[in-house]
């Protein structure tokens, strides 16, 4: 007779079986991970993992359902059904249940699923009858796709066959309807990744050019025919042998990365995050002089791989579109010229030997597309021919005057320049025609600043320049639109854009090397001497305007005069301004903001005025101070402020103040200070609509220790980014502090609640006296922690000998400016001005400083002491 002891023995036996199954899974996972590290091909490991889970599920089924059951079936679907199970992939199951099955069967299935959870499989599952499957699949493309890859594991074959019959293309989701749905799905998926494969932390599975692109090809062809794998695509004439090999190699590479991510993280991780890139690069055997070079080499191979997958995905889907959706359509070719014809609004070579017999047609095809806006693209067979004949673009081709003429014609067209350069890049023609460009295709820079590969960034620069020409985008940057109308030969700007980063990754300064490449390009393309000089100059100096605007004091007339001497004339300034704005906006769209736009426009306007005045006329400080006072006084009188009130404020402020602020800002400050009683200090005001493309925070307070450090600590805690800081000490012991700030999103703070919150928090903190600032509790982002920058301090001389210019390079982190302020206070340093710049994870800040007596730090001992304290406070984190 059974009793409590018997029940406990049964429970212990069941527990032991569960524990044993868990141990088997863990052992299999560890064994496959180890074999992966020792070089076993990933395809073998995936097959073995799939077979192992198949066997495990069959055992569990036998225990809970019984192999002889005819009213139920277990089907693997999704990636598992496809036989592509990685270490931590989802185990997706469909359980088919006969409508006539006894009610007890549902309990059996519940026990079966509970067992799977107990042993750690965590399956995704659905339980349906064949009729329910068909009904659900009729309106849900995800379900029909899963069923398409279904694989019977155990149970009733008749039930599974009924599902296959009920969901056949004749009954639902014809191959044409399925194709259109999958194309729409891919467009949505691509948009989630900004329609580019070139993301710094790409998704290996879902991103453009990832494994999902390969799977989508298989789904569409399988719905249309009896093809089961990629190999069948060759037999059915969809792929050539070479394309099949390229696709298989890409799949193996992406599988390898995804398998490594699963092994490394112990979970289903498909994102190639910064956290893993360096480790995977080492694991895959990449080498380089620096750790960054190792990662960049690995990621360049990744980006080139996914670009190839994207290209093959596009080719195959277009082939399918032509062969299936338009199979019965009668389109008569329309001749375009001797080499091409139009078929259904797509360009097609008139015969397969066109490119072999007329190699220049490899460039001509893109020019024809530009000149015929009704053409939607190139037919798939012709794309394939282009790829097969790229080897014809050799040195003789590149030096052929007719080839050079065709390429320049492409750049000179009034429309389609960006589209066709992108198409040339996709098909591999641009890299073949410009081999130096080919070396930067897929090349990333391992930082948070450059969010695109070099080739993608370059084509975005061209796109931005093209937008400046179009009235529909005039409001994006009115000055750029206005200036572009003055450009006589826009193609020179496009050439400079193509060349400005073409030498990235080469030995030496990429601007200097790029200048030499640009000179050779101009010689080969018969560009005139004057135009060649302009292109060379733009490539060599493409960074000078952004560096000046973001790192130097634009209120200093000498800075403007020096920049004007570099530029020399208005035409060069116009070209450089357009190239600079296009370049910055194409580097990292999230880092472009109204502040940077205002800085560049201020530099452009000031330089234009200096050029009109004449480079031989030295800056006149007294004249500019007098002009600023006159304009500000006119505004103040309009506001009704008495002359004696104006004088009372201004006589306590040095002349330097009138150089560093605009007349409108001077008038605003003066009005506020004149109305402020001492008992109301600290005075904290916000100007939401600053002339500098940001919110200005103005503080008037008694000068004391930690004032800058306290203020920046509070601004940091409030989630504000400081872009610029000016500190003026009055003759009566007061300090005027002006900060230009934006939200971390790059937008200006707005809304009454937010503006009042900023003022109140600052007043509260500054009313507490001269105590050291509180520690900033905000944490650094996950990404920044992977890009530490060694702290470096440099000193530069001020041409006017008013300040010492301190340059701090460090890892950007919460509370950085507050720590700098504390270091200045410790060493008796007076801060007058600060230019704050963040390049990804790298802070590049410029401080204009003096000692307590307002003298520059000339002595090496003083500079060394300050450097030592700064590094102590800022440190390397």
UniProtKB/Swiss-Prot annotation:
Cofactor or coenzyme needed: Mg(2+)
SMART domains the UniProt entry points to: HDc
Activity regulation remarks: Uridylyltransferase (UTase) activity is inhibited by glutamine, while glutamine activates uridylyl-removing (UR) activity.
Keywords from the named record: Hydrolase, Magnesium, Multifunctional enzyme, Nitrogen fixation, Nucleotidyltransferase, Repeat, Transferase
GO molecular function, one term: [protein-PII] uridylyltransferase activity
Annotated ranges, domain ACT: 696-778, 805-877
Stretch list, region Uridylyltransferase: 1-335
CDD domains, per database record: ACT_ACR-UUR-like_2, ACT_UUR-like_1, HDc, NT_GlnE_GlnD_like
Catalysed reactions, as listed in the record: [protein-PII]-L-tyrosine + UTP = [protein-PII]-uridylyl-L-tyrosine + diphosphate; [protein-PII]-uridylyl-L-tyrosine + H2O = [protein-PII]-L-tyrosine + UMP + H(+)
Known EC number: 2.7.7.59, 3.1.4.-
Domain text: Has four distinct domains: an N-terminal nucleotidyltransferase (NT) domain responsible for UTase activity, a central HD domain that encodes UR activity, and two C-terminal ACT domains that seem to have a role in glutamine sensing.
Recorded family membership: Belongs to the GlnD family.
Role noted for this protein: Modifies, by uridylylation and deuridylylation, the PII regulatory proteins (GlnB and homologs), in response to the nitrogen status of the cell that GlnD senses through the glutamine level. Under low glutamine levels, catalyzes the conversion of the PII proteins and UTP to PII-UMP and PPi, while under higher glutamine levels, GlnD hydrolyzes PII-UMP to PII and UMP (deuridylylation). Thus, controls uridylylation state and activity of the PII proteins, and plays an important role in the regulation of nitrogen fixation and metabolism.
PANTHER family membership: BIFUNCTIONAL URIDYLYLTRANSFERASE/URIDYLYL-REMOVING ENZYME, BIFUNCTIONAL URIDYLYLTRANSFERASE_URIDYLYL-REMOVING ENZYME
Protein name: Bifunctional uridylyltransferase/uridylyl-removing enzyme
Species per Swiss-Prot/TrEMBL record: Methylococcus capsulatus (strain ATCC 33009 / NCIMB 11132 / Bath)
Name of the gene: glnD
């Amino acid at each position: 007779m059974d009793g409590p002891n018997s029940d406990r023995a049964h429970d212990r036996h069941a527990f032991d079986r569960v524990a044993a199954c868990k141990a088997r899974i863990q052992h299999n996972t560890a064994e496959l991970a180890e074999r992966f590290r020792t070089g076993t091909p990933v395809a073998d490991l995936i097959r073995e993992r799939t077979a192992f889970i198949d066997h495990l599920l069959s055992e569990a089924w036998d225990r809970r359902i019984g192999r002889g059951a005819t009213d139920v079936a277990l089907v693997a679907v999704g990636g598992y059904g496809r036989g592509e199970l990685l270490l931590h992939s989802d185990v997706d199951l469909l359980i088919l249940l006969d409508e006539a099955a006894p009610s007890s069967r549902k309990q059996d299935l519940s026990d079966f699923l509970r067992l799977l959870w107990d042993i750690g499989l965590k399956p995704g599952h659905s339980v349906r009858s064949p009729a329910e499957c068909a009904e659900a699949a009729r309106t849900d493309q995800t379900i029909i796709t899963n069923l398409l890859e279904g694989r019977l594991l155990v149970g009733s074959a008749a039930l599974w066959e009924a599902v296959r019959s009920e969901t056949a293309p004749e009954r639902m989701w014809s191959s044409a309807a399925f194709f259109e749905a999958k194309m729409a799905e891919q467009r949505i998926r691509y948009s989630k990744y900004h329609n580019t494969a070139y993301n710094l932390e790409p998704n290996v599975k879902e991103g453009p050019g990832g494994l999902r692109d390969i799977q989508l090809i298989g789904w569409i062809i399988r719905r249309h025919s009896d093809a089961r794998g990629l190999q069948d695509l060759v037999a059915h004439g969809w792929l050539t042998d070479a394309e099949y090999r390229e696709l298989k190699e890409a799949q193996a590479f992406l599988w390898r990365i995804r398998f490594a991510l699963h092994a490394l993280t112990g979970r289903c991780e498909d994102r190639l995050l910064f956290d893993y890139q360096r480790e995977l690069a080492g694991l895959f055997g990449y080498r380089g002089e620096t750790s960054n070079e190792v990662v960049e080499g690995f990621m360049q191979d990744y980006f080139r791989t996914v670009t190839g997958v994207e290209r093959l995905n596009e080719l195959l889907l277009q082939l399918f579109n032509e062969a299936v959706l338009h199979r019965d359509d009668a389109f008569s070719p329309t001749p375009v010229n001797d080499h091409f014809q139009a078929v259904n609004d797509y360009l097609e070579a008139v015969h397969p030997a066109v490119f072999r017999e007329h190699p220049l047609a490899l460039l001509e095809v893109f020019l024809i597309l530009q000149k015929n806006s009704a053409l939607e693209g190139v037919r798939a067979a012709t794309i394939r021919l282009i790829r097969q004949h790229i080897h014809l673009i050799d040195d003789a081709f590149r030096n052929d005057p007719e080839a050079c003429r065709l390429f320049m014609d492409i750049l000179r067209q009034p429309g389609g320049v960006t589209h066709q350069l992108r198409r040339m890049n996709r098909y591999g023609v641009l890299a073949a025609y410009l081999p130096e460009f080919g070396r930067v295709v897929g090349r990333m820079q391992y930082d948070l600043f450059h969010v695109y590969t070099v080739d993608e960034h370059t084509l975005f620069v061209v796109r931005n320049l093209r937008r400046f020409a179009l009235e529909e985008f005039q409001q994006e940057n009115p000055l750029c639109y206005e200036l572009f109308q003055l450009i006589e030969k826009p193609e020179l700007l496009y050439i400079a854009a193509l060349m400005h980063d073409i030498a990235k990754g080469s030995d030496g300064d990429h601007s200097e090397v790029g200048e030499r490449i640009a000179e050779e390009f101009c010689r080969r393309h018969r560009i005139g001497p004057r135009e060649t000089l302009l292109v060379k100059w733009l490539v060599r100096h493409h960074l000078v305007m952004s560096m000046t605007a973001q790192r130097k004091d634009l209120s200093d007339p000498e800075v403007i005069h020096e920049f004007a001497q570099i530029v020399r004339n208005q035409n060069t300034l116009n070209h450089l301004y357009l190239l600079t704005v296009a370049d910055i906006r194409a580097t990292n769209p999230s880092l472009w903001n109204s502040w940077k736009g205002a800085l560049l426009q201020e530099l452009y306007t000031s330089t234009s005025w200096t050029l009109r005045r004449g480079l031989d006329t030295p800056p006149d400080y007294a004249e500019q101070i007098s002009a600023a006072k006159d304009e500000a006084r006119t505004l103040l009188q309009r506001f009704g402020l008495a002359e004696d009130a104006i004088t009372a404020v201004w006589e306590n402020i040095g002349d330097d103040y009138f150089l560093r602020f605009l007349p409108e800002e001077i008038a605003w400050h003066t009005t506020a200070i004149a109305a402020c009683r001492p008992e109301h200090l600290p005075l904290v005001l916000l100007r939401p609509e600053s002339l500098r493309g940001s919110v200005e925070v103005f503080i008037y307070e008694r000068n004391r220790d930690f004032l800058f450090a306290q203020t920046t600590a509070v601004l940091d805690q409030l989630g504000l980014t400081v872009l610029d800081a000016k500190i003026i000490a009055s003759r009566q012991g007061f300090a005027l502090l002006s900060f230009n700030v934006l939200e971390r999103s790059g937008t200006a703070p707005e809304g009454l609640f937010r503006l009042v919150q900023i003022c109140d928090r600052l007043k509260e903190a500054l009313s507490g006296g001269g105590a050291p600032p509180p520690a900033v509790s905000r944490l650094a982002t996950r990404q920044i922690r992977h890009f530490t920058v060694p702290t470096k301090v440099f000193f530069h001389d001020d041409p006017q000998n008013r300040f010492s210019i301190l340059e701090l390079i460090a890892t950007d982190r919460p509370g950085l400016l507050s720590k700098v302020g504390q270091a200045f206070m410790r060493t008796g340093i007076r801060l007058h001005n600060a230019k704050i710049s963040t390049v990804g994870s790298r802070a590049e800040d410029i401080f204009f400083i003096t000692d307590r007596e307002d003298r520059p730090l000339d002595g090496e001992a003083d500079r060394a002491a300050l450097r030592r304290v700064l590094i102590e406070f800022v440190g390397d984190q």
